[in-house]
C-alpha cells in the first residue's frame, strides 16, 4: 500500500489561467457580497450608477454599496426617502437635476461624508431651509439653478459648508438674499445669481456691498443680474448700483433739520391748545345760550 502511494504522481503547480479564473470568481463573490447588484433600468460600471432618463417616479432601491457617482437626472422623481443615502458612504457625486423635487428629507446627507458635488437644478424647490445640507460638510459644488418657485434661502442654509466653492442660485424666483447666507462661506469662488427678480431696495445694500468687494473672483454672471424693482431702478444691472443709489436709505438730519422739526412741533402744540381753548369757549357759550332760552320760555 505504501508503495502504491509512492508511485502516484503529485499534481503540478496550478495553471496560470486557472489561477486567474479563481481570482476573478473570488473577486466577483466579494463584489456580490458588498451589495453591487445593479437596479433595474440603471447601468452600473466603475462605481458609477446611471439611472438617468428612465421616467422614474421614485428613486431606485438597493444601489451598489461602493457607488461613488449616482445620476438620477431627467426623471419624474418627486421625493427622496429619509435615510436613502445612509449605506452609500463612498458617494461623491449626486445628480438629481430635472426632476419634480420640492424638498429633501432632513438628515439626508448625514452619512454621505464624501459627497462633493450636488446638482438639484431644474426642480420645484420653493425654499432652502436651514437644515437642508445638514452634515454635508464636504460639499464643493451646489447647483440650485432653474428652480422657478425658489423664493427664500434661509440665512443659515449653507452653514458649515466650509469647502463650498461653487454655488449656483441663478434663474429662480429670489427677490432677496440674506448676506448671512454667504458670509460663512470662506472658500466660495463662483456665485451665480442672474435671472432672479431682485428687488434692489435698502435691504439689498449689504449683500451688494459684500458682492462688489468679491465680484472679480466670486460672481460669474454679474451681467445677468438685474433689478425688477423698485420702479426707479427696474431693469438696471444689479452691480451698476452705487452708494448714491441707496442714499435715501441713510438720511441724516442736520441741526437745522432738528430745529425745524422742533419749531413745527411747537407750532402744532400751540395750535392744538388754541383749538381746544376755542372749542371750550364755544361749548360754554352754547350751554349758556341754551339755558337762557329755557328760562325765557318759562
Curated annotation (Swiss-Prot):
GO terms for cellular component: plasma membrane; voltage-gated potassium channel complex
N-terminal signal peptide: 1-34
Keyword Protease: no
LRRCT domain sequence ranges: 196-251
InterPro entries, per the entry: Cys-rich_flank_reg_C, KCNMA1_auxiliary, Leu-rich_rpt, Leu-rich_rpt_typical-subtyp, LRR_dom_sf, LRRNT
Domain LRRNT: 35-65
Subcellular location: Cell membrane
Disulphide bridges, residue numbers: 38-44, 42-51, 200-227, 202-249
LRR repeat locations: 66-87, 90-111, 114-135, 138-160, 163-186
GO biological process: positive regulation of voltage-gated potassium channel activity; potassium ion transmembrane transport
Topology class, membrane: Single-pass membrane protein
PROSITE patterns: LRR
Tissue expression remark: Mainly expressed in brain.
SUPFAM superfamilies per the UniProt record, alphabetical: L domain-like
Coiled coil regions in record: none
Key words of the record: Cell membrane, Disulfide bond, Ion channel, Ion transport, Leucine-rich repeat, Membrane, Repeat, Signal, Transmembrane, Transmembrane helix, Transport
Residues spanning the membrane: 259-279
GO molecular function, one term: transmembrane transporter binding
Notes on the domains: The transmembrane domain is necessary for interaction with KCNMA1.
Subunit structure: Interacts with KCNMA1.
Role played: Auxiliary protein of the large-conductance, voltage and calcium-activated potassium channel (BK alpha). Modulates gating properties by producing a marked shift in the BK channel's voltage dependence of activation in the hyperpolarizing direction, and in the absence of calcium.
Name this polypeptide is given: Leucine-rich repeat-containing protein 55
Record organism: Homo sapiens (Human)
Biological classification of the source: Eukaryota, Metazoa, Chordata, Craniata, Vertebrata
Amino acid at each position: 500500500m505504501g508503495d502504491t502511494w509512492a508511485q502516484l504522481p503529485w499534481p503540478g503547480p496550478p495553471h496560470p489561467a486557472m489561477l486567474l479564473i479563481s481570482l476573478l470568481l473570488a473577486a466577483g463573490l466579494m463584489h456580490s457580497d458588498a451589495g453591487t447588484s445593479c437596479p433595474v433600468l440603471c447601468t452600473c460600471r466603475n462605481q458609477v450608477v446611471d439611472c438617468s432618463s428612465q421616467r422614474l417616479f421614485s428613486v431606485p432601491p438597493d444601489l451598489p454599496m461602493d457607488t461613488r457617482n449616482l445620476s438620477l437626472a431627467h426623471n419624474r422623481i418627486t421625493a427622496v426617502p429619509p435615510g436613502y443615502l445612509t449605506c452609500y458612504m463612498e458617494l461623491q457625486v449626486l445628480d438629481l437635476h430635472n426632476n419634480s423635487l420640492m424638498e429633501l428629507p432632513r438628515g439626508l446627507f448625514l452619512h454621505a461624508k464624501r459627497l462633493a458635488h450636488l446638482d438639484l437644478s431644474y426642480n420645484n424647490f420653493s425654499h432652502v431651509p436651514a437644515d437642508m445640507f445638514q452634515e454635508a460638510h464636504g460639499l464643493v459644488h451646489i447647483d440650485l439653478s432653474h428652480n422657478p418657485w425658489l423664493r427664500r434661502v434661509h440665512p443659515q442654509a449653507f452653514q458649515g459648508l466650509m469647502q463650498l466653492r461653487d454655488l449656483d442660485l441663478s434663474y429662480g424666483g429670489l427677490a432677496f438674499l440674506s448676506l448671512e447666507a454667504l458670509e460663512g462661506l470662506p472658500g466660495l469662488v463662483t456665485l451665480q445669481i442672474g435671472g432672479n427678480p431682485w428687488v434692489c431696495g435698502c435691504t439689498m445694500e449689504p449683500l451688494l456691498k459684500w458682492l462688489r468687494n468679491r465680484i472679480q473672483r466670486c460672481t460669474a454672471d454679474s451681467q445677468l443680474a438685474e433689478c425688477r424693482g423698485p420702479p426707479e431702478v427696474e431693469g438696471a444691472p444689479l452691480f451698476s448700483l452705487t452708494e448714491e443709489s441707496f442714499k435715501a436709505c441713510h438720511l441724516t438730519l442736520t441741526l437745522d433739520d432738528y430745529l425745524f422739526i422742533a419749531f413745527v412741533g411747537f407750532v402744532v402744540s400751540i395750535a392744538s391748545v388754541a383749538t381746544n381753548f376755542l372749542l371750550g369757549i364755544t361749548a360754554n357759550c352754547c350751554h349758556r345760550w341754551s339755558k337762557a332760552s329755557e328760562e325765557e320760555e318759562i
